[in-house]
From Swiss-Prot:
GO molecular-function term, one example from the UniProt record: large ribosomal subunit rRNA binding
Subunit note: Part of the ribosomal stalk of the 50S ribosomal subunit. The N-terminus interacts with L11 and the large rRNA to form the base of the stalk. The C-terminus forms an elongated spine to which L12 dimers bind in a sequential fashion forming a multimeric L10(L12)X complex.
HAMAP family per UniProt: Ribosomal_uL10
Additional remark text: Ribosomal protein L8 appears to be an aggregate of ribosomal proteins L7/L12 and L10.
Protein name as annotated: Large ribosomal subunit protein uL10
Annotated family: Belongs to the universal ribosomal protein uL10 family.
Organism: Salmonella typhimurium (strain LT2 / SGSC1412 / ATCC 700720)
Keywords: Repressor, Ribonucleoprotein, Ribosomal protein, RNA-binding, rRNA-binding, Translation regulation
Matches recorded under InterPro entries: Ribosomal_uL10, Ribosomal_uL10-like_sf, Ribosomal_uL10_bac, Ribosomal_uL10_bac_type, Ribosomal_uL10_CS_bac
Function noted in UniProt: Protein L10 is also a translational repressor protein. It controls the translation of the rplJL-rpoBC operon by binding to its mRNA.
Length: 165
């Protein structure tokens, strides 16, 4: 489908606006994936706060120019599906990783986080980042564990002191 200049400008403006507020981006090739499966992926993406769009590579190069996602330029080859994580840096990576497990033809090309290119082989680094709630829960568990351990050691020291006296 041929796009006129206004359509192209509108696409670049829309995706650029999303990219400005995004925490991370993941690029994938979805050739060979059925429409039903892609619809499921898009629905899961909306629920996870992930913006997904298939965009022409030339337009994507304009979108990422001068942004933290410029490192992805070399991955824009063939049909490109780009996903921006809006709420959590690992949301798109986690979504694509799970989808790729169930769909052999879906190929994650690369990701970008804070200006760093993350190759597909290391996408787990981004996908396994804990959410804010998970990080707080881990911190609280560690703090709780530490204070309980300290209390046990203090009580043991008091007991030992009483036994020695």
């Amino acid at each position: 489908m041929a796009l006129n200049l206004q359509d192209k400008q509108a696409i670049v403006a829309e995706v650029s606006e999303v990219a400005k507020g995004a925490l991370s981006a993941v690029v994938a090739d979805s050739r060979g994936v059925t429409v039903d499966k892609m619809t499921e992926l898009r629905k899961a993406g909306r629920e996870a706060g992930v913006y997904m769009r298939v965009v022409r590579n030339t337009l994507l190069r304009r979108v990422v120019e001068g942004t933290q996602f410029e490192c992805l330029k070399d991955t824009f080859v063939g049909p490109t599906l780009i996903a921006y994580s809006m709420e959590h840096p690992g949301a798109a990576a986690r979504l694509f990783k799970e989808f790729a497990k169930a769909n052999a033809k879906f190929e994650v090309k690369a990701a970008a986080f804070e200006g760093e290119l993350i190759p597909a082989s290391q996408i787990d680094r981004l996908a396994t980042l804990p959410t804010y709630e998970e990080a707080i829960a881990r911190l609280m568990a560690t703090m709780k564990e530490a204070s309980a351990g300290k209390l046990v050691r203090t009580l043991a020291a008091v007991r030992d002191a009483k036994e020695a006296a």
